[in-house]
Amino acid sequence: MTIKSMTEYETISYKTFLDIFSPLPEIGEILEESESVEEAREKLFEFCKELEWEIRMGRIKFDNEVDRWLALKAIEVFLNIISKDNERLAGFSTLEYLWKAYKGDEEALKEIREGFIEEFRHLFLAMSGKADYSLGFLGKRLLEEGVKFIDFSKIKGREAGIARSNFLDKVYEIMREYISRYPSGLDKRIILKRKKNREILEEFFGITDEEWFNYKWQFKNVLRGLKGVKILRELREVTNFKISDEDLEIIEKAVKNGIPFGLTPYYLHLFDFENPYVEDLAVRRQVIPPEWYVEKMIEHKEDRNIAFDFMGEHDTSPIDLVTRRYVTIAIIKPYESCPQICVYCQRNWMVQDFDAKAFPGWEKVEKALDWFAEHDSMIEILITGGDPFSLSDKAIEKMLNRIAEMNHVVGVRFGTRTIVTAPMRITDELAELLGSFEKSLMISTHVESCYEITPEVAEAVKKLRTNNIYIYNQHVFHRYVSRRFENVALRIALKKVGIIPYYTFYPKGKMEHKDYLVPIARLAQEVKEEARLLPGSFRTDEPIFNVPRMGKNHLRAWQDRELIAIKPNGSRVYLMHPWEKGIYPTKLYTYEDVPIKEYLDSLKEIGENIEEYKTIWYYY
Ligand SMILES: *Cc1c(COP(=O)(O)O)cnc(C)c1O
């Protein structure tokens, strides 16, 4: 499951490079005849303006109005990329690479990767109106299935209504085929598999159902440290549970180097014991760290809390345990670990092992609560961590009682993943305690795939909802949950158990998480080509980019970001607009994305047909 490092790709041939200009040979000619980058810049600007005007005057014919719109967008992107001012912001010149490479400069050609070539191949196709984007991937599938597109200007009334309805049923057939690739934990087959796994584990641990369904037993028996590795080894020896030597060694290396690893027995039973990394790909990747991650974390063992504090939390904490980035809400972190550790955790620089030391002590917690009491701007308090449901009911009650006295606080939100990692934590007592809180109380949880949604999750959610507590989901759209319609399958499963999709996060570009990254373009594509096929009440999540220090911002479109450069390795460079835009002056944030080509290669490795993703290049 390792991703090829970029240096392993071969140097691009000059001919391959020249080929990309075939939709717009004029661009190649300008690069050829220009004596300098500056000359090329001026001439390309003139050319683009003329091309734009020809389009706007209707002198260029397009197969479809959408392809015409895309051509205008692509011209804008190209102008952005060749703009001198954007070069200043990006810190380098994309145009210089294009110009040098066109002149056959070997150094430039050596540096340029396939990802760069592909970006420009598609950009030039789009600018010339030949992208065929309007058909999308679904349109192509429909044509393959022999479905005829109906011209609704030719038929009317009931006839049109029936034709459209029949056509939409065909669309659903394709959608259903994709969704069915992702088994849900509510499927009978999976429920039976898990029942068997539970029995195997109960026998292995020498316990009864009663202990299994008791969260205290689950918490006490979290697989962690060297003991956890030993248990996984033993389990492999005496049961049908499969795990590779490689995985065991990586986990062992992680725990020996103080990198937190934690896995609840409950979550372990979600694994497919006999077929690793097929149906349970996302579940295993949730907790088993890839080698690269472990290496990077070891490299930065000493300065981890600086190197990996990607969100700049050190600079947004007015007092210990509190993080404030917004006007009316701040975070309090009363427990700095979780029963289960997510490999891609953005707080990986601070999470500790799951034990008593992760509780900072009442003195600190009370001081942090005092801070909330003193700030009447705080209308909501987000209690997270770590996982606050690691704390006892008593501790939770104590915090809530204190917050109940703060008149300005309207609501409390808990950020917890126990609903997924140890759903038995949601006892009747806890649900009633939370339900008895007189202010608004909600929970945001973190379900990554429909495979994690089980009858146990459904029961935990039901207990909370009968106590008037709403549960929202924060989904991290990482590489192993980002396939076609995978997020759609998740949204449907969430809806079945009563969890409301809230955020779909772009997995931030933290280098130790390289194997989990997904380009922004894939999120944008998912929203448009997949989520859009669901009813509005199912697609309530917003795509979000977390701007370091500043806070979360939407990833909707050009009102939130601008593509300003393409690195020779194919990474897009964006200017991200923070949420404060239009509220007070603030700096934009320059961000380098993961190359689309690298992402597509990794999808191919997990068996995807990347032809089905090819419109991704047209999401800027
Ligand atoms: C995410 C986050 C919140 C909550 O933001 P919402 O948009 O209300 O979900 C609050 N404070 C901090 C520091 C956060 O990172």
Curated annotation (Swiss-Prot):
Domain Radical SAM core intervals: 324-586
InterPro entries according to UniProt: Aldolase_TIM (IPR013785), Lys_aminomutase/Glu_NH3_mut (IPR003739), rSAM (IPR007197)
Annotated keywords: 4Fe-4S, Iron, Iron-sulfur, Metal-binding, Pyridoxal phosphate, S-adenosyl-L-methionine
Cofactor note: Binds 1 [4Fe-4S] cluster. The cluster is coordinated with 3 cysteines and an exchangeable S-adenosyl-L-methionine.
UniProt-listed SUPFAM superfamilies: Radical SAM enzymes
This protein's record includes keyword S-adenosyl-L-methionine: yes
Residues where N6-(pyridoxal phosphate)lysine is found: 552
Gene3D superfamilies: 6.10.140.1170, Aldolase class I (3.20.20.70)
Cofactor(s), by name: [4Fe-4S] cluster; pyridoxal 5'-phosphate
Gene Ontology molecular function: any one: catalytic activity
Residues annotated as binding [4Fe-4S] cluster: 338, 342, 345
Pfam families: Radical_SAM
PROSITE patterns registered for this protein in UniProt: RADICAL_SAM (PS51918)
Record's keyword annotation contains Membrane: no
Family: Belongs to the radical SAM superfamily. KamA family.
Name the record gives this protein: Uncharacterized KamA family protein MJ0634
Lineage: Archaea, Methanobacteriati, Methanobacteriota, Methanomada group, Methanococci
